[in-house]
Amino acid sequence: MESLQDKITHLRTLLRHYEYQYHVLDAPAVPDAEYDRLMGELRELEAAHPELLTTDSPTQRVGAAPLSAFEQVRHEVPMLSLDNAFDEESYRAFNKRVQDRLKSSDDLTFCCELKLDGLAVSLLYEQGELVRAATRGDGTTGENITANVRTIRAIPLRLSGDNIPERLEVRGEVFMPLAGFEKMNEQARRGGQKIFANPRNAAAGSLRQLDPRITAKRPLTFFCYGLGLLEGGEMPRSHMARLQQFKAWGLPVSDRVRLCHSPSDVLDFYHQVEADRPALGFDIDGVVIKVDSLEQQEQLGFVARAPRWAVAFKFPAQEQITTVRDVEFQVGRTGAITPVARLEPVLVAGVMVSNATLHNADEIERLGLRIGDRVVIRRAGDVIPQVMSVVESAEGARDVIFPTHCPVCGSDVERVEGEVVARCTGGLICGAQRKGALKHFVSRRALDIDGMGEKIIDQLVDKEYVKNPAELFELTAGKLTGLDRMGPKSAQNVVDALAKAKQTTFARFLYALGISEVGEATAANLAAHFGTLEALMAADIDTLITVPDVGKVVASHVRNFLDEESNREIIRLLVEKAGVNWPDVVVVKAEEIDSPFAGKTVVLTGSLSILSRDDAKERLQALGAKVSGSVSKKTDLVIAGEAAGSKLAKAQELGIDVIDEQEMMRLLGE
């Protein structure tokens, strides 16, 4: 006789199978009424025997209580973005870069997929069960959207099949099919509710609902396209084979995937998909081209925020014609003056566009643009609106006059020889530059001052409370409570965040200064090379050029910034008066360091409880170690934290020395 547990297990298995048939394969196996009957039977059994209820039951997709806010999630493996190609020439340039880096003239095998126009998400499965879902966020930190993702029936709450890793992080895209989007908007129109401009906005808005019961009513689906974290298991060494493995475990994968063995194969796939785009039933904005071999992917590696082995080959953006009403000039944080066309509003690719960038004076001259002209507007990459051409010059059209003085502060505008950008010379006396510089300084990747949003910065500058980054640290809770929507508790939280932000790293400090052309990766290279602020400030251009990824242009920007007396004074105030500080960066050759880690290739795996992974990495590097992300025959040492998986197993298989976190701390001298 069948036991109660067996009956419940059987019902769950049936329902999961029917969900997969319906939502993933689009091939319903039973009538809706039969599915509803089985679901009702399972709900009754679980209600009568709550001790048998599990979190991966099909009944648990909907019903979680509304959240007050989304929890932040730090990605254990960063979710990187992709570089773009917008035409055949830039795609062929990508292909050549890959061949050159691999030192091969042979045609490579690429796995080509659709570039879905939705929201990138991460799904973490432990022992086959979905335990967490998160947005991509900034690639390092996202938001926990588990309760909402559990309502998407295309996403299995438990994986099926064999050889499922202990921990598996799947990356993919949540999106809304066009039919569901149109039906949802039609219902909203009839009810006098908000309608969404396009399916992407609808998908993003649905996933960011604090009440998962609302998300459950939205017609969302999902395709997976890649792997993040993998522990306690193995995956094939081909991207295509990995997609097939995902499918075998019950994860939805697009059927428009092809292995291409030459550039002509890739272009054929691109043009076929472009032709089929209107009939797909969901929005895409291009195709993604990935080197299929994992070995070659590892050889190619990454640049700062994107892999070298993949590119997003975008479709030509959608275009519309409209009228230029006016041209205004915006001032950025580095003083760059950008002309912006104010347009007769027009719908382009599902978005109402009323402004478009004109880039610079040369672009206005190239276009021959005048105020009143009829122009072609394009959303480049389907995102940033820009003016492409003039199609009709109106009677009475007015010339665009580029300002000789800053429209914000009145300072002179200059154009440096060799640069196309005109800049305000006002520096931090310019309100626009001041706002931009302060917003950059407090941003997450810079000093990461929690609670210091754009609207607060705008008020601080408008009220003349803050004129430079150093003055942020002089703010009091009393002064902050004078700002709009800033109560005593919020004000104190900002003051506390400012105090906390004084403890930073040399690399973050350099990035926060907002030196032109110095991004995160360049700031990290400068910090590692010079070690101290004094050494960097004394470096001439020839010395700066010796830093990895720093060319003559970047070196000139760094030197010019540091030569400016007002910038040097702000740096002095930040360090000496405000007390911004960071751990010493010791720049010593590995062979000169007396440390058990000196000159060793070290891999960290599992969860650390004493130090964060970033802190451990910095400490090891300071002692001359090279910290790698993967185990190979070249690895000297593996440091295993809790729940260490496949890396630990591989290290043991290769006979590599393994220590735990406690031993690492002892060797660090703690």
Curated annotation (Swiss-Prot):
Pfam families: BRCT, DNA_ligase_aden, DNA_ligase_OB, DNA_ligase_ZBD, HHH_2, HHH_5, Nlig-Ia. Its cofactor is Mg(2+); Mn(2+). SUPFAM superfamilies: BRCT domain (SSF52113), DNA ligase/mRNA capping enzyme, catalytic domain (SSF56091), Nucleic acid-binding proteins (SSF50249), RuvA domain 2-like (SSF47781). It comes from the Bacteria. Residues 592-670 form the BRCT domain. GO terms for molecular function: DNA binding; DNA ligase (NAD+) activity; metal ion binding. GO terms for biological process: DNA repair; DNA replication. Zn(2+) binds at C406, C409, C424, C430. NAD(+) binds at D32, A33, E34, Y35, D36, S81, L82, E113, R136, E173, K290, K314. Keywords: DNA damage, DNA repair, DNA replication, Ligase, Magnesium, Manganese, Metal-binding, NAD, Zinc. Its EC number is 6.5.1.2. InterPro entries: BRCT_dom, BRCT_dom_sf, DisA/LigA_HHH, DNA_ligase, DNA_ligase_AS, DNA_ligase_CS, DNAligase_adenylation, DNAligase_N. GO terms for cellular component: cytosol. The active site is at K115 (n6-amp-lysine intermediate). It catalyses: NAD(+) + (deoxyribonucleotide)n-3'-hydroxyl + 5'-phospho-(deoxyribonucleotide)m = (deoxyribonucleotide)n+m + AMP + beta-nicotinamide D-nucleotide. The keyword Ligase applies. NCBIfam families: dnlj, PRK07956.1. DNA ligase that catalyzes the formation of phosphodiester linkages between 5'-phosphoryl and 3'-hydroxyl groups in double-stranded DNA using NAD as a coenzyme and as the energy source for the reaction. It is essential for DNA replication and repair of damaged DNA. Belongs to the NAD-dependent DNA ligase family. LigA subfamily. This is DNA ligase.
